[in-house]
């Protein structure tokens, strides 16, 4: 399988998706036809989200079609060489994808050679479940099971920092809560600017920041760019 799972879409001082464009270009391998899944968009319309994505990827020769615009979404997924899943609210993304019957077809198409690109919520959707999203559950997705393309759970935008005087849980504390009730899981705390690239059966960590791996009953382990999962 070919996956590009990004923690986030924007870095300080850079345009939207700018840091990801070289990664995307490197993994295209001649692919040009893409379907975009915009359902995580809440404060922007799906048309706006699709158009923005199409504009950014056009210089790479990628032709982007919003899945909500086609008459036959299943046929569009089957024909797609690239499946792009944008960030936003993970619960809405999963709900809309499930209700349209897109989860199994997307997973099957990626397993048969389509490139999967997802950032933030889109990275969450590639995991076994969305249980490590940071998002507010604004809708009920009728279950947390997702695409299960990547075997570990990703927590995008990972940071353990708290604002001064803040008394809420750290991100690690929230992840530890999950591991109490689901000790079989492994969670990757993927900070902004980092990504996981899967190609030719190898999953490789990239980015400038330290990534953390959490397992039940174990200390967190720090990983740097180049680590192979």
UniProtKB/Swiss-Prot annotation:
> Which UniProt keywords are listed?
Cytoplasm, Dipeptidase, Hydrolase, Protease, Serine protease
Enzyme class, first EC level, given as a word: hydrolase
**What Pfam families has UniProt attached to this entry?**
Peptidase_S51
* Active-site residue list: 120, 135, 157
The Gene Ontology terms for molecular function here are: dipeptidase activity; serine-type peptidase activity
Report the main location listed first in the record: cytoplasm
- Its Gene Ontology biological processes? proteolysis
Q: Which domain of life is it from?
A: Bacteria
InterPro entries hit by this protein: Class_I_gatase-like, Peptidase_S51, Peptidase_S51_dipeptidase-E
How is this protein annotated for GO cellular component? Answer: cytoplasm
Q: Please verify whether the record's keywords include Nucleotidyltransferase.
A: no
- The catalytic activity of this protein is classed by the Enzyme Commission as 3.4.13.21
* Localization per Swiss-Prot or TrEMBL: Cytoplasm
This enzyme catalyses: Dipeptidase E catalyzes the hydrolysis of dipeptides Asp-|-Xaa. It does not act on peptides with N-terminal Glu, Asn or Gln, nor does it cleave isoaspartyl peptides
Similarity comment: family membership: Belongs to the peptidase S51 family.
What exactly does this protein do? Hydrolyzes dipeptides containing N-terminal aspartate residues. May play a role in allowing the cell to use peptide aspartate to spare carbon otherwise required for the synthesis of the aspartate family of amino acids.
- UniProt cross-references to NCBIfam families, sorted A to Z: PRK05282.1 (NF003642)
Protein known as: Peptidase E
Q: Which organism is it from?
A: Salmonella typhimurium (strain LT2 / SGSC1412 / ATCC 700720)
């Amino acid at each position: 399988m070919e996956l590009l799972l990004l923690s986030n879409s924007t870095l300080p001082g850079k345009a939207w998706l700018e840091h990801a464009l070289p990664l995307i270009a490197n993994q295209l391998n001649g692919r040009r036809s893409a379907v975009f899944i915009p359902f995580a968009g809440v404060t922007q319309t799906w048309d706006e989200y699709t158009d923005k994505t199409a504009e950014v990827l056009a210089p790479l020769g990628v032709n982007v079609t919003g899945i909500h615009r086609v008459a036959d979404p299943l046929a569009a997924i089957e024909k797609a060489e690239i499946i792009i899943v944008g960030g936003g609210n993970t619960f809405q993304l999963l709900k809309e994808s499930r209700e349209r019957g897109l989860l199994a077809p997307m997973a099957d198409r990626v397993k048969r050679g389509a490139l999967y690109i997802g950032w933030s919520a889109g990275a969450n959707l590639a995991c076994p479940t969305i249980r490590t999203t940071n998002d507010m559950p604004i809708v009920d997705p009728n279950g947390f099971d997702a695409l299960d393309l990547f075997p570990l759970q990703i927590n995008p935008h990972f940071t353990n920092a708290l604002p001064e005087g803040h008394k809420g849980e750290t991100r690690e504390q929230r992840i530890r809560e999950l591991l109490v009730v689901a000790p079989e899981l492994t969670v990757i705390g993927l900070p902004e600017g980092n990504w996981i690239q899967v190609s030719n059966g190898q999953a490789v960590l990239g980015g400038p920041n330290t990534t953390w791996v959490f397992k039940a009953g174990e200390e967190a382990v720090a990983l740097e760019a180049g680590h192979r999962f």
